[in-house]
């Protein structure tokens, strides 16, 4: 299955405690069907000091979200949208916004 959301995309959370927040996708975990979004789903982790540079204590970091909890934000219309696929004349497959019809992939 083709990936509708990729690393570097801007997404909006549509359900849960962070509903309405937007952020950039840092990492996609396809086997787990999850992704990590910058500034969303922040959790606190208790960390031991390791080595000389690492400081211990309580740190905040982003936890993974399920794909179904986010929608891609179209760069042209700036709205959360569903994603479709089109095949161009040159044979390349691109993602497009289902609200405004603009191509999302940058080339």
Curated annotation (Swiss-Prot):
**Would I find Nucleotide-binding among this entry's keywords?**
no
Report the GO terms under cellular component: ribonucleoprotein complex; ribosome
Lineage, top-rank taxon, reads Bacteria
Entry's Gene Ontology BP terms: translation
**Which CDD domains does the UniProt entry name for this protein?**
KOW_RPL26
What does the UniProt keyword field contain? Ribonucleoprotein, Ribosomal protein, RNA-binding, rRNA-binding
Q: Which InterPro entries match?
A: KOW, Rib_uL2_dom2, Ribosomal_uL24, Ribosomal_uL24_CS, Ribosomal_uL24_KOW, Translation_prot_SH3-like_sf
Q: In Gene Ontology terms, what is one molecular function of this protein?
A: structural constituent of ribosome
Quaternary context: Part of the 50S ribosomal subunit.
Family named by the database record: Belongs to the universal ribosomal protein uL24 family.
- State its role: One of two assembly initiator proteins, it binds directly to the 5'-end of the 23S rRNA, where it nucleates assembly of the 50S subunit.
Q: What is this protein called?
A: Large ribosomal subunit protein uL24
């Amino acid at each position: 299955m083709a990936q509708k959301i990729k690393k570097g995309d801007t997404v909006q959370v549509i359900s849960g405690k962070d509903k309405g927040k937007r952020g950039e996708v840092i990492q996609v975990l396809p086997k787990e069907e999850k992704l990590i979004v910058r500034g969303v789903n922040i959790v606190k982790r208790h960390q031991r000091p390791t080595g000389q540079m690492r400081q211990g204590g309580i740190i905040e970091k982003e936890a993974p979200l399920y794909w179904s909890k986010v929608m891609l934000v179209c760069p042209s219309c700036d709205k959360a949208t569903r994603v479709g696929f089109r095949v161009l004349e040159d044979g390349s497959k691109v993602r497009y916004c289902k609200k405004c019809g603009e191509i999302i992939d940058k080339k």
